[in-house]
Amino acid sequence: MRSVSFASAVALCLCLAPEMLAQGGGGRWRRPEEITNRTGAFFTDIAGPTADGDKVADLATLELARTAKSANQMVVLYLVDGGDDQDTREQFESTLFANDELGIELKFFHCARIDLAKEPALKTKYTKQAPLFVVFDASGKPVELSMSGYKPQTSALSKLLEKQAAGTVKPSLAGFAKTYGGIIQDLEQVLSKKKQALQKQAKAGGDQGKRAEADKDVKALEAEEQKILTKEKDLLSKVRLPERDAKAQRVGAPRWGGRGGAPGGGDAGGGRGAGGGTGSGGGTPAGGTNGG
């Protein structure tokens, strides 16, 4: 995982301080959609495999798993019981998926969530292991990671993704996540500074001196933003990311204005973006995280 120096962390906090205050203080702040679309964990809700009474087919028989295997692509299945306590689930997901680099690594996988509360036979089989992650490599070989008791294991999940991606993502999934994470961090800082500059520009009114200064700052920050986006585009052009399903939802997002439904709700995912844009209307740049 990418480590951030103390100086960088302080600089980022200073840049984002006004936004944190705008959200009511307490250290809570809403990250721009341009950032969460790049770093969030997006999953598509799907039904489990066919069941005959208390017997259920193997997870590898899912259409998503079979289609991904035929395309030499990877899959992450998230099995969770939507009947469990919602606060516990949401805290688990919020903690587990708070790491940007994990969200970046998930971009290389088709990600789907199965609600065990709606799958009696599957629940009987996996209830002791859930929440459970099943990660299929490009050849269709699955490896399971149980987080029973809702104990988040971010590092363990990341290492499993990296293991299953070995040989498929080159030179390495961890290396890509570290590089892309740095680009996104730079972009987030510039977007924050640009937002503040635009606010100063709006408040300048008829003061020509203040407006000229604000205009200069905005122009410089927009130029810096474009440099970062070009760097991002160059990096993404070297990899192939699976399409994000239009029904994908962000899992682990903070609840700002209410609670979602079982098993977790979340922000809408959106489709594949054009690559490099930071507008809030599009999807994730140059590919997404989810199949379905």
Give, region by region, the residue ranges found by the protein language model:
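Charged, amphipathic alpha-helical linkers/stalks
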Residues: 153-203
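Non-catalytic, surface beta->alpha helical segment in thiol-disulfide oxidoreductase systems
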Residues: 128-172
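Charged, low-complexity interaction regions
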Residues: 202-213
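Bacterial N-terminal signal peptides
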Residues: 7-19
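Local sequence-structure signature of Cys/Sec-based thiol-disulfide redox active-site neighborhoods
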Residues: 26-103
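Conserved segment of the thioredoxin-like fold in thiol-based oxidoreductases
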Residues: 83-132, 136
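Amphipathic alpha-helical coiled-coil segments
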Residues: 217-247
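Disordered, low-complexity segments in secreted/periplasmic proteins that are enriched in proline
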Residues: 21-28, 245-292
